């Protein structure tokens, strides 16, 4: 059964783009035909992730000035050839784990990052926007028919905006992504009550995805008794004494206890099931290509979390 899954959030910074990319890549790795769409019209990022420039952008398709074949880029072979080269190097060095090739197909559709193109969509007249809504629906239909897509993964703009709402309208499954902060919680309530309720009534399924949850990363133990150590630039960095580490650990434990109840309470209040708790993996946040984690590090805990999320869907 074909599925269209949209990653959305009340505000930016919840990691939805990373989750969307890794979910799409993992599905393709499993042998599925996957189309990944950057429908974050206001702040697109996939062109940087994949270092690709298409013949035509999604913006062009929405304004009826491009066909879908000119928009979608097949990135399967480029990933696999890159991995074979990397595996060869690792094999010679006898270190690291080999990356896993994509056995399915992965296409990417990119939004134009240029200011004038974003402004053109944002300031379009009512008739143009009405036509664009039809094009959104047609986009989904073409990906299902022409590309035989098993899955369409959509990264949307955060918040309650015209283009983000219409991105959600083409999805069967809505993943409302949030972090464990008051701003995310309050904003998620607004989005769920004002937007998601309508989509659920029309047959869409919605779930809460808690991302960057505390519990994986722990404070690094001090490696020296010295109060200061030199960093790379030669300047000094003050080190926390060991009893400070204990205090931080105790504080984290207290925070965890205080936060134990509200995730389930929010789920109950909104009538939206929690589908995943994904810890904050500090090492991933500092990767230059965190969107490739499931491909490059198949045994990483984050990869298992994405596996669980996909299985739950």
Where do the language-model regions lie?
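Walker A/P-loop phosphate-binding motif and the immediately C-terminal alpha-helix
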Residues: 2-42
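Short amphipathic alpha-helical segment that frequently serves as the phosphate-/nucleotide-binding helix
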Residues: 17-22, 185, 189, 303
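Conserved GTP-binding G-domain of TRAFAC-class P-loop NTPases and closely related GTPase folds
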Residues: 259-260, 275, 280-312
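P-loop/Walker-type NTP enzyme "switch/lid" segment
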Residues: 41-144, 285-292
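Hydrophobic/aromatic beta-strand patches that form the interior of the parallel beta-sheet core
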Residues: 5, 37, 107-109, 173-175, ...
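Conserved catalytic-core segment of NTP-binding enzymes
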Residues: 29, 134-275
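Short, hinge-like loop/turn segments at secondary-structure boundaries
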Residues: 52-56, 194-195, 224-227, 293-295
């Amino acid at each position: 059964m074909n599925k269209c899954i949209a990653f959305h959030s009340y505000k930016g910074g919840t990691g939805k783009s990373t989750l969307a990319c890794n979910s799409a890549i993992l599905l393709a790795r499993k042998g599925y035909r996957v189309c990944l769409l950057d429908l974050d019209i206001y702040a697109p990022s996939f062109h940087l992730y994949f270092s690709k420039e298409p013949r035509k952008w999604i913006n062009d398709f929405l304004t009826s000035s491009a066909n879908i074949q000119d928009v979608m880029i097949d990135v399967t072979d480029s990933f696999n050839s890159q991995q074979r080269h990397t595996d060869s190097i690792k094999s010679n060095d006898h270190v690291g784990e080999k990356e896993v090739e994509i056995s399915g197909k992965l296409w990417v559709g990119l939004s134009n990052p240029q200011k004038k193109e974003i402004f053109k969509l944002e300031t379009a007249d009512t008739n143009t926007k009405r036509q664009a809504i039809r094009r959104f629906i047609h986009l989904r239909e073409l990906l299902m028919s022409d590309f035989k897509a098993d899955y369409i993964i959509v990264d949307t703009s955060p918040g309650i905006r015209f283009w983000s709402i219409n991105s959600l309208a083409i999805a069967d499954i809505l993943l409302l992504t949030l972090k464990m902060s008051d701003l995310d919680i309050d904003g998620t309530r607004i989005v769920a009550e004002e937007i998601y309720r309508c989509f659920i009534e029309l047959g869409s399924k919605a779930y809460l995805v808690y991302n960057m949850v505390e519990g994986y990363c722990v404070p690094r133990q001090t490696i020296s008794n010295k109060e200061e150590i030199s960093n790379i630039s030669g300047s000094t960095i003050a080190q926390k004494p060991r009893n400070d580490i204990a205090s931080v650990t105790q504080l984290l434990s207290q925070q965890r206890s205080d936060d134990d109840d509200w995730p389930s309470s929010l789920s109950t209040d909104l009538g939206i099931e929690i589908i995943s708790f994904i810890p904050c993996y500090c090492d991933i946040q500092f990767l230059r290509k965190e969107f490739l984690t499931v491909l490059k590090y198949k045994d990483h805990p984050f990869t298992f979390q994405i596996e669980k999320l996909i299985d739950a869907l």
